[in-house]
Amino acid sequence: MTKIVFMGTPAFSVPILESLIEAGYDVQAVVTQPDRPVGRKKVITPTPVKEAALKHNLLVLQPEKISGSPEMEKVIDLAPDLIVTAAFGQFLPEKILKAPKLGAINVHASLLPKYRGGAPVHYSIIEGEKETGVTIMEMVKKMDAGAILSQRAIPITKQDDVGTMFEKLSILGKELLLETLPKLIAGEITPIPQVEEEATFSPNITREQERIDWQKTAEAIDNQVRGMRPWPTAFTTYQGTNWKIWAVTPLTETTTSAPGTIIQRSKKALWIACGEGTVLQIDRLQPAGKGQLTIQEFLNGVGQNVAEKDKVD
């Protein structure tokens, strides 16, 4: 039986871990990030992967930094045949990558070499890609640069956001991993090197990237909103207060008004001018200190003073 150490952290990784257990692989240990404070009350909370591992009575290791840690030595002492990672969130030192006889592989949520890095799902949507997918690749010292073992694509629809794509890609990832592992173990896969010249990157989203640039087209802003939903959430500013923007609709109407201008405000609708004369309808938002509101709830409540020709930025 193939001995595996699994490394992962968020909900995306849980179905992948559970698929290994259900398929009968010997999961010797699970390495995940330390428990962290979560929410406004800063409640110390285990990672989704830790919760799943404990349900299966697996050994859980939680190094603050795995490089040079006692947990790293523990993984090496376990002498696994293979390390499988999925959104672990830390770099692995060469010492641990070379320890298993089959090496270490990663389940990455993009069609590598596109979108290496920590936010591939976000960028795939923000950049308006029509498809994304999962790549299983060998792990090397350089981030997400290892040779490809297998890859599969799925479409991104205009209804998808980060949440829906994470769910789809997690399922795709576990299916592809279970197809790939027997071939890898049997030595039947010839890894395909990535083309470095085609590599693009998806670093973690910054606060400034979350701010909506109304000079962009309505479609581009829609991509941004969906590519940051449900986290970290796109926002704009109205008269010094922030609005988180949760849902929008690009319209076919056009305008000559300056980008960021409110061009229609009724009891049920709020339209904003965008770049290239395009128009965006706001469907759902969250004013500072409030919960999410439909645009009708907002305009007839805390947003009743919002008027046409006002600006957002």
From Swiss-Prot:
GO molecular function, one term: methionyl-tRNA formyltransferase activity
One Pfam family linked to the record: Formyl_trans_C
Top EC class, one word: transferase
Catalysis: reaction(s): L-methionyl-tRNA(fMet) + (6R)-10-formyltetrahydrofolate = N-formyl-L-methionyl-tRNA(fMet) + (6S)-5,6,7,8-tetrahydrofolate + H(+)
Domain of life: Bacteria
CDD domains: FMT_core_Met-tRNA-FMT_N (cd08646), Met_tRNA_FMT_C (cd08704)
InterPro entries linked: Fmt, Formyl_trans_C, Formyl_transf_N, Formyl_transf_N_sf, Formyl_transferase-like_C_sf, GART_AS, Met-tRNA-FMT_C, Met-tRNA-FMT_N
Transmembrane region(s): none
SUPFAM superfamilies membership: FMT C-terminal domain-like (SSF50486), Formyltransferase (SSF53328)
Keyword vocabulary terms for this entry: Protein biosynthesis, Transferase
Annotated positions binding (6S)-5,6,7,8-tetrahydrofolate: 110-113
The protein's Enzyme Commission number: 2.1.2.9
Any one Gene Ontology cellular component term annotated for this protein: cytosol
Residues in the signal sequence: none
Membership in a protein family: Belongs to the Fmt family.
Function: Attaches a formyl group to the free amino group of methionyl-tRNA(fMet). The formyl group appears to play a dual role in the initiator identity of N-formylmethionyl-tRNA by promoting its recognition by IF2 and preventing the misappropriation of this tRNA by the elongation apparatus.
HAMAP family per the UniProt record, alphabetical: Formyl_trans
Name of this chain's protein: Methionyl-tRNA formyltransferase
Organism of derivation: Enterococcus faecalis (strain ATCC 700802 / V583)
